[in-house]
Every structure is written in C-alpha cells, then in structure tokens.
Amino acid sequence: MEVILLERVAKLGQMGETVKVRPGFARNYLLARGKALRATEANKKRFEDQRIQLEARNLERRNEAQAVAEKLDGQSFVLIRQSGETGVLYGSVSTRDLAEVLTQNGFTVGRDQFSLNQPIKTLGLHTVPVVLHPEVEVTVTVNVARSPEEAERQARGESTVVRDELDLEELGLEVGAALAEAGPEGEER
C-alpha cells in the first residue's frame, strides 16, 4: 500500500514522501496515528494544499521538543527497586516506570517515546534514549538501586553488587584437611 507521510518517520522517510508499506503497518500505525494518508489523487492534492500548514506545525513541534531536550539531555533519574544479592531485579523497569519518573520530575514524556529494546532487569546505571520528536533524540541516565544511599554510591562509580569473595588459599587448606581426614575411600577415620 502506498501512503504519503505527514511527518518524518524513522527508517521510512521524510514528510511529503510517497512510500510503499505493508497494509497492516499502514492501517494499524501510520493511518491510525495520523502520520500518513493513503496515496490517492485526492489525498495528494489535499496534501499539497496543506503542505505549508503541516510544515509549520512540524516546525513548532520540533522547537517545543528541542526546548524540552535542552533541559532533559544528560539528566539522571533514580529508581528504587528490590533485587537479589547478585543485582538482578525481582521485577523490571519498563517504559511505563520511566515515563512516571520523568513526569514526577516535571517532564511530559510518554512511554512510547523511550527506545528500550527490553526492560531493565539489573541494578546500575543505564542510558536510555528518548525520542521527543522524529528529529530530536536525547539520552537520560537511569540509576536503578535498592536504596537512595546505594544510588549515590553507584553515581560515584562504586560497585554495589555483593560478590562471594573467597580466599582461595584458605579454601585449599580446608579441602586438603578434609581429604586427609577422610582417608583413601572417602570414609571418616
């Protein structure tokens, strides 16, 4: 199916281009969200008549996104979550959680504006891209920790995950002593 793009769509094209896409993608995403029109003669004429208005609206949205981007770029946000000793979260941090944290901090960002391939499932610092406009993208740092104190340590670069630290020399002596006591058949003497 051919459609006329009403705004820039990543990996597809610029505003005003006529592109061929699969019918399901056109119906369920592009047409449903107002990002495109079917490429009929009537719609082509309508687009050309409204092109100046669409470009002005796109420029206005881009300028608004740029203003938010200047404040948001490079910001760090802390999320407190429960996790195991190895640093794996019991749940996960999804785009919904990220949108909620940014909203609490005064930024209006929808969950569909985050570019997360999969939810965050570990403690630590994570960089997350935020697409505010098809032409404006920023990154924020998400600090996932068990407590505010741990978040501060992570921000300074200290490791907070507990690792089993064994003294190998001491372990070798204990194993050797146990084997000597057991005898050749593995039985206690």
Curated annotation (Swiss-Prot):
<dbReference type="GO" id="GO:0006412">
    <property type="term" value="P:translation"/>
</dbReference>
<keyword id="KW-0689">Ribosomal protein</keyword>
<dbReference type="InterPro" id="IPR020594">
    <property type="entry name" value="Ribosomal_bL9_bac/chp"/>
</dbReference>
<dbReference type="InterPro" id="IPR020069">
    <property type="entry name" value="Ribosomal_bL9_C"/>
</dbReference>
<dbReference type="InterPro" id="IPR000244">
    <property type="entry name" value="Ribosomal_bL9"/>
</dbReference>
<dbReference type="Pfam" id="PF01281">
    <property type="entry name" value="Ribosomal_L9_N"/>
</dbReference>
<dbReference type="GO" id="GO:0003735">
    <property type="term" value="F:structural constituent of ribosome"/>
</dbReference>
<comment type="similarity">
    <text>Belongs to the bacterial ribosomal protein bL9 family.</text>
</comment>
<dbReference type="InterPro" id="IPR009027">
    <property type="entry name" value="Ribosomal_bL9/RNase_H1_N"/>
</dbReference>
<dbReference type="Pfam" id="PF03948">
    <property type="entry name" value="Ribosomal_L9_C"/>
</dbReference>
<keyword id="KW-0699">rRNA-binding</keyword>
<dbReference type="InterPro" id="IPR020070">
    <property type="entry name" value="Ribosomal_bL9_N"/>
</dbReference>
<dbReference type="GO" id="GO:0019843">
    <property type="term" value="F:rRNA binding"/>
</dbReference>
<keyword id="KW-0694">RNA-binding</keyword>
<comment type="function">
    <text>Binds to the 23S rRNA.</text>
</comment>
<protein>
    <recommendedName>
        <fullName>Large ribosomal subunit protein bL9</fullName>
    </recommendedName>
</protein>
<keyword id="KW-0687">Ribonucleoprotein</keyword>
<dbReference type="InterPro" id="IPR036791">
    <property type="entry name" value="Ribosomal_bL9_C_sf"/>
</dbReference>
<dbReference type="GO" id="GO:0005840">
    <property type="term" value="C:ribosome"/>
</dbReference>
<dbReference type="GO" id="GO:1990904">
    <property type="term" value="C:ribonucleoprotein complex"/>
</dbReference>
<dbReference type="InterPro" id="IPR036935">
    <property type="entry name" value="Ribosomal_bL9_N_sf"/>
</dbReference>
